[in-house]
Regions:
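RNA pseudouridine synthases
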Residues: 2-253
């Protein structure tokens, strides 16, 4: 247990369940209308049938922490860490959600993926949602760093990895995860969209069992003041540790 963090992670193996216990959430920004947190990996934003058995949610924890009712302004996967916006009034939440719908919000992610990616690429590949509807989906990414380890993998004598910066142009469910798997550069630790062999390698060799996808930045207009806002979330320690393991050089701005 790491007590020096803003949240506490307890990992127990009991009947094949993983239990998380979170303490105070890291607040990145707060005023009378908005509050932004650096959401830990493994914490669902709110209760839904997709998150399975869990008793803790960011919505509930933040409400109890600041003693005010909060409303999520957008989605962020349970397995993804990083910037998550909430509002303190339902009306303000609707105003922010309108910015998302009109694509006036820019979100940036960092991910560690298998292989050497292109230097820059736009992935334009439609995705099918849960109801079977095919939707436009576009993700732009750039390679930040790459490395090669003297570690045999499959038919290859070495293992290659890339750190990439991604900007989704649309907001489909699991869009980044599905797009990276589609171009054969799956995100390390991603289940079910990743590479099972790589995930097993990282778990057994380095005890890395979390998904290497982090929402690092979000840029939007304040729904009340119209001021341009840029919020950044520092990388989780596990992400930093994995960068070090793979010799991927990265310095956040």
């Amino acid at each position: 247990m790491r007590t020096n963090l803003t949240f506490c992670f307890v990992y127990l193996i009991l009947f094949n369940f993983t239990f998380y216990t979170f303490l105070n959430l890291q607040i990145l920004y707060q005023d009378e209308h908005l509050v932004a947190i650096n959401k830990p990996n493994g914490l669902a934003v709110h209760k839904s049938k997709l998150v399975g058995n869990t008793n803790e949610f960011a919505l509930q924890l933040l409400r109890d922490q600041i003693r005010k009712r909060v409303y999520p302004a957008h989605r962020l996967d349970r397995k993804t860490s990083g910037v998550m916006l909430f509002t303190l009034a339902e009306k303000v939440s609707s105003m922010l959600q309108k910015q998302f719908m009109e694509r006036n919000v820019s979100k940036n992610y960092l991910a560690i993926v298998r292989g050497y990616t292109e230097t820059h690429e736009v992935i334009d590949y439609p995705l099918t949602n849960y109801s079977g509807k095919v939707q436009e989906a576009i993700t732009e990414y750039s390679r930040v760093a790459s490395s090669e380890l003297d570690l045999p993998y499959g038919k290859h004598e070495t293992s290659r990895y890339s750190l990439i910066s991604l900007t989704p142009k649309t907001g489909r469910t699991h869009q980044i995860r599905k797009h990276m798997n589609h171009i054969r550069h799956p995100i390390i630790g991603d289940r079910p969209h990743g590479c099972n062999k790589q995930n097993k390698l990282f778990k057994n060799r380095w005890e890395v069992n979390t998904m290497m996808l982090h929402a690092s930045e979000i840029e939007f207009s304040h729904p009340i003041t119209n001021k341009k806002m840029l919020l950044k979330a520092d990388l989780p320690n596990e992400f930093k540790r994995t960068l070090k393991i793979l010799s991927l050089n990265f310095t956040s701005a």
